Amino acid sequence: MSRLFLFALLGHLCFLPYLDAITSSSGPPRVQVYSRYPPDSDKSNFLNCYVSGFHPPQITIELLKDGKKMENVEQSDLSFSKDWTFNLLVSAPFDPNSNSEFACKVTHSTLNEPKVVKWDKDN
């Protein structure tokens, strides 16, 4: 009986910091949209959307061109931070000098509605 109690106590003590880290740090995802190179660069460019600080790990991230889902989108492997929140990078080739509007759309359980962040050519 005492072994069972010790295992239960140990499991409880190991799980509490994890649970505390998740509940104290999980808020809505942070979204950053940027190009790999400056828009005036002659290099082939990529639109990046870095989403961080989210938990649980289930998330949908879409890159948009004029409101429509972009093609040839690649996604990094899911990674996590010391506080047990998750991070993802999504990117796609794009022409920053076109007259199109580019954005990143994030859907997550901590959001009441999808979050759309537009790419700002000047930042």
From Swiss-Prot:
One GO MF term attached to the UniProt entry: MHC class II protein complex binding
Keyword presence, Disulfide bond: yes
Domain of life: Eukaryota
Pfam families on file: C1-set
One GO biological process term: antigen processing and presentation of exogenous peptide antigen via MHC class II
Subcellular location: Secreted
Disulphide bridges: C49-C104
Signal peptide: 1-21
Subunit text: Heterodimer of an alpha chain and a beta chain. Beta-2-microglobulin is the beta-chain of major histocompatibility complex class I molecules.
Role description: Component of the class I major histocompatibility complex (MHC). Involved in the presentation of peptide antigens to the immune system.
UniProt family annotation: Belongs to the beta-2-microglobulin family.
Name of the protein: Beta-2-microglobulin
Name of the encoding gene: B2M
